[in-house]
């Protein structure tokens, strides 16, 4: 993936995540531009470019699927959940006060 594609994905993800919140959207755009401008003179074959592009793609994915904004409507808040918002099944919450075992019966340290 090229840096230009990662830049565009990140800008679109910010627009989806912060739609309707012009102050936050503008700040996100400025931060994205600043981050890419700082690296604009780095050669394309530099070994630091691939991890930077991967990081930009991860941030874009996180913004699209995990950021939800709430707006105050009277005494309540309304969440702006969009089609890309990740929706969990909350299985662990449904268990109540039960103990959840992760990784089996291994003992830790000297216990």
From Swiss-Prot:
GO terms for molecular function: protein folding chaperone. InterPro entries: Complex1_LYR_dom, Complex1_LYR_LYRM7, MZM1/LYRM7. GO terms for biological process: mitochondrial respiratory chain complex III assembly. Pfam families: Complex1_LYR (PF05347). Keywords: Chaperone, Mitochondrion, Transit peptide. It comes from the Eukaryota. It is found in: Mitochondrion matrix. One of its GO terms (cellular component) is mitochondrial matrix. Assembly factor required for Rieske Fe-S protein RIP1 incorporation into the cytochrome b-c1 (CIII) complex. Functions as a chaperone, binding to this subunit within the mitochondrial matrix and stabilizing it prior to its translocation and insertion into the late CIII dimeric intermediate within the mitochondrial inner membrane. Modulates the mitochondrial matrix zinc pool. Belongs to the complex I LYR family. MZM1 subfamily. Interacts with RIP1. This is Mitochondrial zinc maintenance protein 1, mitochondrial. The gene is mzm1.
